[in-house]
Structures are given as C-alpha cells and as structure tokens.
Curated annotation (Swiss-Prot):
Keywords of the record: Ribonucleoprotein, Ribosomal protein, RNA-binding, rRNA-binding
Cellular component GO terms, alphabetical: ribonucleoprotein complex; ribosome
Function per UniProt: Binds directly to 23S ribosomal RNA and is necessary for the in vitro assembly process of the 50S ribosomal subunit. It is not involved in the protein synthesizing functions of that subunit.
Source taxon at top rank: Bacteria
PROSITE patterns in the cross-refs: RIBOSOMAL_L20
Family: Belongs to the bacterial ribosomal protein bL20 family.
BP-aspect Gene Ontology terms: ribosomal large subunit assembly; translation
Pfam families linked to this entry: Ribosomal_L20 (PF00453)
GO molecular function terms attached to this record: rRNA binding; structural constituent of ribosome
Name used for this protein in its record: Large ribosomal subunit protein bL20
Length: 139
C-alpha cells in the first residue's frame, strides 16, 4: 500500500495558508498562490530591512543639514569641523540633538566653526609654503 503522508502535507499547506492571513483574494485561500505570496513577502521584508537603514540615514542627514544651515554651515563642513574638533557623535545622535535641543547643537556648530577656521589657517600656511612662483624652464 502506498503511503501518501496526508497529515504532513496538510500541515505544510495549512502553515502557508496561515502565514498568508490578511492577504486579499486567492492569496489567502489558495495554497499555491498563498505560497508564492508568502515567499514574495519574505523577499520584501528582507529588502525593506536594508532600505529602512538607508531611509533613516537620509532622514538624519536632512535634519542635521537643516540645523547646520540655520547656524551658517553646510552639512559637509559641519561634519568635517566636528571631526577636526574631535567630537565623535554619530548622525543619529546629532539629528536627535538638532531636533530636541537646538542650543546644544548651536554649541557643537560653533566648535566645528572654530576647528574649521584653525584648520583653514593651517591649510593656507601649508599651501603658501609649498607654492613656488619662481619656476623657470630652460630650453
């Protein structure tokens, strides 16, 4: 006699139909369509877990940029100035400070400006020392 494995097959099919709860139409009733949709849902979930990280980073950068421009700096100059000043705050924390405590963010922006101005003086001195305007080529 052939063994068909009825209870195992039924349990497997019920599992997919149960996972498809909340879908519209045949996607929640029909096993074959439900299985395809559940697999597709897993792909969407995987993709969007990655996209969530990107979207939050974009949001944080937009918030930091808006607050930086209110203090007379661009985003890139603010971040470079904070790096020069030795401030090690990530974008998430900077965005939270910009939204909730603008006075503290202004102090951080002032630190960045000070670090940028001192670095700018060093860069100008370095370029002045390396620039030689009396170059002559003899032929």
């Amino acid at each position: 006699m052939r063994v068909k494995g009825g209870t195992v097959s039924r349990a497997r099919r019920k599992k997919f139909v149960k996972l498809a709860k909340g879908y519209r139409g045949q996607r929640r009733i029909n096993y074959k369509v439900a299985k395809q949709q559940v697999y597709k849902s897993y792909l969407y979930a995987y993709r969007d877990r990655k996209n969530t990280k990107r979207n939050f980073r974009k949001l944080w950068i937009a918030r930091i940029n808006a607050a930086a421009r209110m203090n007379g700096l661009s985003y890139s100059k603010l971040m470079h100035g904070l790096t020069l000043a030795g401030v090690e705050l990530n974008r998430k924390m900077l965005a939270e400070i910009a939204v909730s405590d603008f006075d503290t963010f202004t102090k951080l922006a002032d630190q960045a400006k000070a670090a940028l101005s001192s670095d700018n003086v060093l860069v100008q001195a370095r370029t002045a020392a390396t620039t030689d305007t009396t170059v002559s080529v003899e032929r």
